[in-house]
Amino acid sequence: ETVTLNNGVKMPLIGYGTYQTPPRITERCVSDALHIGYRSIDTAQCYGNEREVGLACQKSSIPREELFITTKLWGCHKYADTLRSIDASLRRLNLGYIDLLLIHEPSGDVHEIYRAMETAYRDRKLRAIGVSNFMPERYLDLINHSKVVPAINQVETHVFRQQRELRRLECQIGTKHESWSPLACGQNGIFKNPELSRIAASHGRSISQVALRFLVQQGIIVI
């Protein structure tokens, strides 16, 4: 199942994340994920495993156009160094283009960083651009200083942290919401929660399935 971003690009509703996956096992993990049906793979510059993600995708028999690769910028401050950073990710992934590029967090001169992303987007190096960990105030500030509306805002979102205000804003403006840590990092007693346990039992499902369904049923993309 896919969702359509604000520029018409289709993105899988569920993706495989590589956070805290050491480079030495990333290629195997991503290959396994692709083998069982994942087509959306999420990485980041600060994860240190872009190259291995790219290798797994290259070695698979899956056509490039069926894959959706997300990565995130880290440590950029100005326009020029952001352009260089984008090109470095393109080289490491070695997949021709990046499907979705995000600002990993609202630090540095986000207006200059995003302006460079808009340039790379116009140059067709990127199919879509967006942000990550932008709360309402920072999100609205970026919107007011950009030409391209972010396609995605990837934020910690789960049954215990639903981000309702942020999601309302994004819906009004045209940005899709994406969840990282959809199972709350296993915290807050999620796997023993009485209400989730009751719902899971009544539907013959696991708590994990219920927690994920809670998100995807609302059109929230899940990593």
PLM regions: where:
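Beta/alpha (TIM)-barrel catalytic core signal, keyed to glycine-rich beta->alpha loops juxtaposed to Asp/Glu
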Residues: 105-223
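A short, structured active-site edge motif that brings together acidic residues
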Residues: 64-77, 99-106, 133
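CE4/NodB-like, metal-dependent polysaccharide N-deacetylase domain
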Residues: 82-103, 119-123
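N-terminal binding-site loop/beta-alpha segment at the start of enzyme catalytic domains
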Residues: 1-67, 183
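Short, acidic/polar
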Residues: 21-34, 77-93, 112, 137-140, ...
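Alpha-helical scaffolding within the catalytic cores
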Residues: 1-3, 51, 55-58, 86-87, ...
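Residues at the N-termini of beta-strands
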Residues: 40, 97-100, 128, 152
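Acidic-and-aromatic substrate-binding clefts and catalytic sites of carbohydrate-active enzymes
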Residues: 21-24, 42-52, 75-80, 106-111, ...
